[in-house]
């Protein structure tokens, strides 16, 4: 597969990430995981704001001896697979696939999930239904088409983002994460599927599974993933449901001019960046050079500097041609002064601590 490059970064790109080992001490119970938010495909045309899509990416093997996982950037999903866009509505596609137990599952999902989505009869008018169905279908196809047992013993988390018009659809199965910058404020676009999530625990237990020492059935750190067909009691080919689910949670929003960029990262990134810290870090770098690929490289390098030893991947999508602006604070009777989002966040933390 190949796509056109956009500013040296918008292309079909392959890389790898891997699951970061997590100790039980890292698990804190969350109260809730968000449910799906729906939006009609046609709403993308309801405003004069037109996103200018740019993207960049970077992967690093980190402290590992091998790269298990993958990512993908496709500027025109339908055209990439020989299909025509509906009403000339271009759909771009981005994904990070964080593999474990080998690279086979991550590479299979990277290579096949976009195609399965495009070839669905309801694409693109019912994208939410299509994406949810395609995750599960790709998972089943991986089990059916693997010709050797080693491939079946691998698994992968998967997070994808699709942009069409002014709509952004994020689908997540696992613990990769997507964070949106809305005028310098971090907006969580996905929930980590780990055993610390209360809704995930309830789902697991309702399907006969259990959590042991922070692991699903004592075997897996994530509660949703594709692959892992070798693990007993978690799912069966052709059977609906199961403690380990390949069905993604979806979140869709309408983009506005306040929305600056989206960061997609493997879990190793988020173990060393909070959502807001990642947004602050990214805004500052983009204001310096406005180079998305370089910014992804800097995010990965900063995670390594902070102690990350896993494979790492960062993908960024910007919705504007220009860099994010400095935020301004009105001071009555005084001249406006610029202050960065990072500075505002630090000030807020300081004031809340008093």
Curated annotation (Swiss-Prot):
Q: InterPro entries per the record?
A: PP2C, PP2C_BS, PPM-type-like_dom_sf, PPM-type_phosphatase-like_dom
Binding residues for Mn(2+) 2? 98, 267, 310
Q: Which family does it belong to?
A: Belongs to the PP2C family.
- Write down how the cofactor binds this protein: Binds 2 magnesium or manganese ions per subunit.
Which Gene3D superfamilies does the entry link to?
A: PPM-type phosphatase domain
Record's protein name: Probable protein phosphatase 2C 27
Q: Which PANTHER family match?
A: PROTEIN PHOSPHATASE 2C, PROTEIN PHOSPHATASE 2C 27-RELATED
What is the scientific name of the source organism? Oryza sativa subsp. japonica (Rice)
Q: Upper lineage ranks?
A: Eukaryota, Viridiplantae, Streptophyta, Embryophyta, Tracheophyta
């Amino acid at each position: 597969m190949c796509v056109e490059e956009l500013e040296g970064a918008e292309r079909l790109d392959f890389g790898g990430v891997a699951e970061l080992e997590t100790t039980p001490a890292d698990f804190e119970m969350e109260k809730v995981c968000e449910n799906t938010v729906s939006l009609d495909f046609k709403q993308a045309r309801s405003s004069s704001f037109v996103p200018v899509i740019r993207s960049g990416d970077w992967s690093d093997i980190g402290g590992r001896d091998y790269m298990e996982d993958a990512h993908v950037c496709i500027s025109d999903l339908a055209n990439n697979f020989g299909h025509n866009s509906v009403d000339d509505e271009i759909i771009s596609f981005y994904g990070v696939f964080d593999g474990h137990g080998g690279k086979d599952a991550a590479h299979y999902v990277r290579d096949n999930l976009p195609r399965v989505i495009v070839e669905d009869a309801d694409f693109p008018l019912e994208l939410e239904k299509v994406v949810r169905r395609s995750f599960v279908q790709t998972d089943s196809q991986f089990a059916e088409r693997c010709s050797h047992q080693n491939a079946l013993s691998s698994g992968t988390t998967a997070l994808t983002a699709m942009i069409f018009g002014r709509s952004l659809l994020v689908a997540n199965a696992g613990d990769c994460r997507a964070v949106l910058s809305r005028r310098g404020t971090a907006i969580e676009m996905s929930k980590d599927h780990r055993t610390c999530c209360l809704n995930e625990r309830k789902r697991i237990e309702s399907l006969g599974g259990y959590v042991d020492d922070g692991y699903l059935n004592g075997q897996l750190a994530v509660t949703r993933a594709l692959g892992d067909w070798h693990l007993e009691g978690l799912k069966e080919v052709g059977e609906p449901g199961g403690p380990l689910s390949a069905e993604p949670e979806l979140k869709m929003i309408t983009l506005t001019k306040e929305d600056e960029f989206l960061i997609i990262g493997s879990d190793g990134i988020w173990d060393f960046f909070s959502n807001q810290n990642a947004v602050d870090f990214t805004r500052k770098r983009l204001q310096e050079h406005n180079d998305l690929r370089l910014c992804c490289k800097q995010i990965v390098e900063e995670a390594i500097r902070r102690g990350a030893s896993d494979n790492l991947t960062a993908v960024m999508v910007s919705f504007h041609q220009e860099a994010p602006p400095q935020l301004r604070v009105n001071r009555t009777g005084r001249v406006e002064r610029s202050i960065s989002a990072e500075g505002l966040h630090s000030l807020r933390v300081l004031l809340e601590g008093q």
